[in-house]
Amino acid sequence: FWILDPSVSPMAAFNNPDNRRVTPKMYLTAMSQQTNDILPEPMVLMPYLAGRERSVDMVVENGEVIAAVCRRKEGALQSIEQSGVAFELAKTCAQIMQADGLVNVQTRDDANGKPYLLEINMRPSGGVCYSRSCGINLSGIFALRKLGLIDKETAIKMGTDGFKPAVVRSVSSVIALTEQQSAE
């Protein structure tokens, strides 16, 4: 995404294109030079949300949230929680959408800390596995429910009992082990 920032130099997009900041005037100038025959591709414009991003993973059955865990993203770290305005917003979204399955809702706070809905994914997120680090195994709860091995009340209890706040760091590199290390 690009940030329309009136405080950056008109050359910002050229001097540091990876920063993805451009003046609104520069953007409007480029748009005005488009001919009627060649319209720009459709775009989504939204306010810049400077606050924290949250990812809420949930086990949902026909809009009823059975279990949920929220990951608050802070750089390379993610703090896992089970409360807050963004957490409640995500649960309400799943209910309104009548979500069903292992789903994910993304929010981001504005500069004042108010969360805004970014998207709801009717599928598991890539980070759903991190829920285990806080004592709640969302994938396990989902599987047990789908297999009919636990009732809804047990699943709800599994989604809250044993919760402990945790902080995780995503590691995406491969660490090669020696034969001796892998045998241990």
Residues of each region from the PLM?
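Amphipathic alpha-helical segments that line or abut small-molecule/effector binding pockets
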Residues: 88-92, 136, 140-147
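Short solvent-exposed loop/turn micro-motifs enriched in small/polar/acidic residues
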Residues: 49-52, 100-102
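Beta-strand scaffold of nucleotide-dependent catalytic cores
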Residues: 2-4, 43-47, 53-71, 89, ...
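A long amphipathic alpha-helix within ATP-dependent nucleotide-binding catalytic cores
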Residues: 34-42, 72-112, 117, 121-123
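Active-site nucleotide/adenylate-binding loops and adjacent lid/helix of ATP-dependent enzymes
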Residues: 1-43, 50, 62-64, 72
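Detector for glycine-centered tight turns/loop "hinges" at secondary-structure junctions
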Residues: 63-64, 112-113, 148
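ATP-dependent carboxylate-activation loops
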Residues: 79-81, 125-141
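Peripheral (often C-terminal) accessory segments that flank ATP-dependent C-N-forming ligase machineries
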Residues: 141-184
